[in-house]
Amino acid sequence: MSSIPVSMGVCALALAVTIAGGCSNTGVITEAYATLAEAQAAGAVDRGWLPRGLPPATRELRVAHDENSHRRWGLYEFPPDQGDALRPLLGAEISFDGLSCNPPRRIEWWPVLLRAELDGERLKATGLRVYAASDADLIHAVNWAQGRGYYWSRE
């Protein structure tokens, strides 16, 4: 007889945890832009969701930002021959070791390898190099050969 209240209590707790987990990160907005010009016209750069200084031909941009904090995540593609235009945005190359990235799980376009505690050896094997941004509290991971970059707020 006493197992019924315990079971109901456990169910109520599980439901509360599920609801609370589902409501976390509700202030995170995601957006997609075909070109850098489109992102600029929408105000993504002026609002700080997208870093200033991306190469002019940057395309296929995905942006996520938290309205309740300064957290942000993004990815973009650029022509590899315009990589030199990206370098002023970046500081010195740093190690992946000790870095973490924890975007909300609902940001489905964010790579699995760039979630949680980062595995430097695996990431370097994919061609990614990591940099601290030269003028913001961002981390950038760039695959120069593929012309693809990712950025996120330092945790």
Feature map (PLM): residue ranges:
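N-terminal "mature-domain start" segment
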Residues: T30-E60
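A short, solvent-exposed beta-edge/loop patch
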Residues: D119-E155
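Processing junctions and N-termini across compartments
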Residues: A14-V17, S95
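Bacterial signal peptide processing site
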Residues: S24-T26
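Bacterial N-terminal signal peptides that target proteins for export
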Residues: M1-C11
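Mature extracytoplasmic domains of secretory-pathway proteins
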Residues: R52-E121
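C-terminal motif of bacterial Sec signal peptides marking the signal peptidase cleavage site
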Residues: I19-G22
